[in-house]
A protein has these predicted regions:
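Aromatic-lined, polymer-binding surfaces characteristic
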Residues: 90-180, 184-191, 195-215
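Well-ordered alpha-helical scaffold segments within catalytic/enzyme domains
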Residues: 51-71, 115-129, 145, 155-174, ...
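Helix-terminus loop motifs that line ligand-binding clefts
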Residues: 69-108, 242-251
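Acidic, Ser/Thr- and Gly/Pro-rich intrinsically disordered linkers and low-complexity segments
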Residues: 34-39, 94-104, 197, 249-267, ...
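An acidic-aromatic substrate-binding cleft motif
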Residues: 1-86
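Extended, well-ordered alpha-helical scaffold segments
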Residues: 3-11, 69-88, 127-146, 169-192, ...
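Short, charged/polar micro-motifs that form catalytic or ligand-binding hotspots
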Residues: 38-49, 102-110, 200, 270
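Terminal, non-catalytic domain-edge segments
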Residues: 183, 187, 210-351
Length: 351
């Protein structure tokens, strides 16, 4: 909680754009911890959309949990980001989520949809404004209109959306999204372990979404076939984790090249930790809660805590830790200077 509070304060004070470019007004952007400046380019992994949504989700969750000292300042910042999101990234009427500010969707990417759903859900939970809940539903519907049934989305908030629609008395929307989620889980069960390639050919964050989607649908429906389907995926997911006595590695899913794509140094190599590793922890803890298997609860907690080393005492953060001593003859073993997309790691710890 202390790390989250300091991180949120840093984002509000240092990572929100208030300059002359109208298109970026209110955006949360990557930050260069060496030069102490904001970073934004049209390049996918450094733009004002996509994974950077995690900063908005983090601040919304921290506000709900009363973690922030200057609540008024943080809430005003989030309002500005919310306005940016609606103005530059999302068509709230249709549910379209764009890849970059300026409503630029020249690069089509389904991964952006569940993050937008999560952001608007957290805003609904914080402010109680029904339009945010409705927007989350429209984005979900748009995701599935674009063949989302065969996609492996990271952070699709199935249970949360169903719960919030139930609380709000939106029974028609609840039935609609439940049917969509069920079809998605059925499709992933049918595919089984014959995983299709995504942005990379095969990785932990293809297997984990399969397990998580199916397991969440089990939580929503109680149908045993979804538990069995999720267990098939979890058996594969476990293969990405080790139990080495090193905080970089223990229950940290193997990932590689994330520092190259999202970092300043652009170095290839294994990233231990990388924040998406903690997605395994989310799935393990959900499985433990639904089955009573305490071993998975412990493993899940270790996985979630494993990414906290990416956040520092002064509120700064790193997008990845390059674990090898050297990569292609270049010295590694360092935390990349860019704070970029890592805040999902804290979001998971506040969930």
């Amino acid at each position: 909680e202390t790390l989250a509070a300091k991180r949120c304060a840093f984002i509000v004070d240092h990572q929100q754009y208030h300059g002359k470019i109208k298109e970026l007004q209110g955006a949360y952007l990557p930050y260069d911890n060496e030069e102490k400046i904001l970073v934004c380019t049209p390049e996918n992994d450094f733009n004002a959309g996509r994974e950077r949504t995690g900063m908005g989700v983090l601040i919304a969750r921290a506000l709900q949990q009363n973690l922030l000292k200057d609540r008024e300042k943080a809430e005003q910042s989030l309002r500005e980001y919310h306005a940016f999101y609606l103005r530059e990234l999302v068509n709230a009427a249709t549910g379209l989520v764009c890849n970059c500010s300026g409503k630029d969707n020249s690069y089509f990417r389904l991964y952006n949809y569940p993050w937008a759903v999560t952001f608007f859900l957290e805003c609904w939970k914080l402010w109680g404004e029904k339009e945010n809940l409705k927007t989350a539903v429209r984005i979900t519907e748009k995701f599935y209109e674009q063949d989302g049934f065969r996609f492996y989305p990271i952070e699709m908030p199935i249970v949360m959306l169903c719960q919030e629609l139930e609380k709000a008395g939106e029974q028609e929307d609840l039935k609609t999204v439940r049917d969509l989620f069920r079809r998605h889980a059925d499709q992933l069960i049918e595919i089984g372990t014959a995983y299709p390639a995504s942005e990379v050919n095969y990785e932990q964050s293809i297997v984990q979404p399969a397990a998580e989607v199916i397991l969440q649908v089990y939580e929503v429906t109680g149908e045993e076939k979804y538990l069995r389907g999720a267990e098939q995926q979890i058996a594969v997911l476990e293969l990405f984790d080790g139990q080495q006595p090193d905080y970089h590695l223990h229950e940290t899913a193997i990932r590689h090249w994330d520092g190259y794509w999202f970092g300043k140094r652009r170095v290839f190599g294994d990233t231990f930790p990388h924040y998406w590793s903690a997605e395994n922890g989310r799935t393990f803890k959900r499985y433990a809660r639904l089955t009573g298997n305490e071993e998975y609860n412990i493993r899940g907690e270790h996985s979630l805590r494993g990414v906290l080393s990416m956040f520092f005492e002064d509120g700064t953060a790193t997008c990845a830790y390059l674990y090898p001593y050297s990569v292609n003859g270049q010295k590694a073993d360092f935390a990349d200077p860019y704070a970029n997309d890592q805040d999902w790691g804290l979001c998971m710890n506040l969930e």
